[in-house]
Amino acid sequence: EMQRSLVGSEMCIRDRPIARRLLARCREEGAVFVVDDRVELVKAIEADGVHLGRGDMPVAEARRVLGEGFIIGGTANTIDDIRRLHRESADYIGCGPFRYTETKANLAPLLGIEGYRAIVAQMYQEGISLPLCAIGGIQREDVPELLATGVNAIAVSGAVLKAPSPRQAMADLINMA
């Protein structure tokens, strides 16, 4: 299912045993391969980057380990989280959750549409221009309203991987953007 959803997408993976195989497949498809949390794995297999959660290694430390040329993203739930990631020179921010999701345990407070509007407005006011990716419980029908808030990207792993045809679900979502 993961391979069927690769076309035209970025993929964030947490499963170490299949990382090398997925990296090769991502290269074939021209997809970006970001590993969740595992900085040493990113370095070892030369993945495109790492996504760091709120309790993970600081961005600056990951940058020291990886060096330049790797994407380093971080998780945020508040404007204070975003300010910190901006100071640490993150390349992008995964911000959420939008709503309850089954793909992540121990969720931070839900943001909803108004939360994203407020965060995007505050980022603009403060001159923080990091790409902001909405994440957490997002379904196909949420995409237009979320994009209207000013977020730069939307993570939709559940909506894609649980679809009868992940490839078609991804294609439909790409066509909406």
Language-model features: where?
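Histidine- and aromatic-rich ligand-binding microenvironments
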Residues: 30-32, 40, 49, 57-59
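Alpha-helix-loop-beta-strand connector modules within alpha/beta enzyme cores
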Residues: 17-35, 54, 62-77, 109-133, ...
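Alpha-helical scaffold elements within enzyme catalytic domains, especially in hydrolases
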Residues: 5, 21-25, 84, 145, ...
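Glycine-rich phosphate-binding active-site loops on the catalytic face of alpha/beta enzymes
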Residues: 9, 54-62, 94-107, 143, ...
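Conserved PRPP/pyrophosphate-binding segment of the phosphoribosyltransferase/PRPP-pathway fold
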Residues: 22, 36, 82, 95, ...
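Catalytic cores of alpha/beta
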Residues: 35-48, 77-89, 128, 132-134, ...
